[in-house]
């Protein structure tokens, strides 16, 4: 793929500890949905994924694709429309319902028996299942292994102190010959407390390097006018491909 870079080409910020104690609770994330504070949602889908999607899929059908912290990501329908099975997890029931409504998909809901008080929402077509629960409770549901993970807005949203647990959860869900597509953000963490949090290349190596080959495919300027309120003047997004060693 053109635009391929190694980590050596990518600017990193040295102060990686400044955000380590930042915490957002599940209730605070749910409040963001209730109050419409979801600027992280991309109505047109993620452009880097759109650019590389057919290359990643290689004409295959019937893949199992996992969306951690899925929100109402329109990319879930991209995969479903191509004949793949999509599973997502999201703490906000509102976000899940909005996905099905905005994509004009009928759905059913049922309790998750392994996690009392939670639900799974399933499209009538049967190829989209969205679990409304904590990502850390999900392994209790025995949802199986996945061929691909699309992680955009997930690792960068996880509290820094929970990253190791999160990464171990993701690795436990990966099947043979997996593709783990990971988007992270690069900005000066001394100027913005997050989320989204700054995730440097070294952190990706620490979390996934023992199991995965790690390759940065592309780096793009992601700075928008709204980011000025964060106190920053530049923001880059990096797309990584993690594969089985």
Swiss-Prot record:
Monomer. It catalyses: S-adenosyl-L-methionine + a thiopurine = S-adenosyl-L-homocysteine + a thiopurine S-methylether. The modification Phosphoserine is found at residue 14. Its main location: cytoplasm. Belongs to the class I-like SAM-binding methyltransferase superfamily. TPMT family. Its EC number is 2.1.1.67. This is Thiopurine S-methyltransferase. GO terms for molecular function: S-adenosyl-L-methionine binding; thiopurine S-methyltransferase activity. It comes from Pan troglodytes (Chimpanzee). It is an enzyme of class 2 (transferase). The keyword Phosphoprotein applies. S-adenosyl-L-methionine binds at residues 29-40, 69, 90, 134-135, 152. It is found in: Cytoplasm. GO terms for cellular component: cytoplasm. InterPro entries: SAM-dependent_MTases_sf (IPR029063), Thiopurine_S-MeTrfase (IPR025835), TPMT (IPR008854). Keywords: Acetylation, Cytoplasm, Methyltransferase, Phosphoprotein, S-adenosyl-L-methionine, Transferase.
């Amino acid at each position: 793929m053109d635009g391929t870079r190694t980590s050596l080409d990518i600017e990193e910020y040295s102060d990686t500890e400044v955000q380590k104690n930042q915490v957002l609770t599940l209730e605070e994330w749910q409040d963001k949905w209730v109050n419409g504070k979801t600027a992280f949602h991309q109505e047109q889908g993620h452009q880097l994924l759109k650019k590389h999607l057919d290359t990643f899929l290689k004409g295959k059908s019937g893949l199992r694709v996992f969306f951690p912290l899925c929100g109402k990501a329109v990319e879930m329908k991209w995969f479903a429309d191509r004949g793949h099975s999509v599973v997502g997890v999201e703490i906000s029931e509102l976000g899940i319902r909005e996905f099905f409504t905005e994509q004009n998909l009928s759905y059913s809901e049922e309790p998750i028996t392994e996690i009392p008080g939670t639900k799974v929402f399933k499209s009538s077509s049967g190829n989209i299942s969205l679990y409304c629960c904590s990502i850390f409770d999900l392994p209790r549901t025995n949802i199986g292994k996945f061929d691909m993970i699309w992680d955009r807005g997930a690792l960068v949203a996880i509290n820094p102190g929970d990253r190791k647990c999160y990464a171990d959860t993701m690795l436990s869900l990966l099947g043979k010959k997996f593709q783990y597509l990971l988007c992270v953000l690069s900005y000066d963490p001394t100027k913005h407390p997050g989320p989204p949090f700054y995730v440097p290349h070294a952190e990706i190596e620490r979390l996934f390097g023992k199991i995965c080959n790690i390759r940065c495919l592309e780096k793009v300027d992601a700075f928008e006018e709204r980011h000025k309120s964060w106190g920053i003047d530049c923001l880059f997004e990096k797309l990584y491909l993690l594969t089985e060693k």
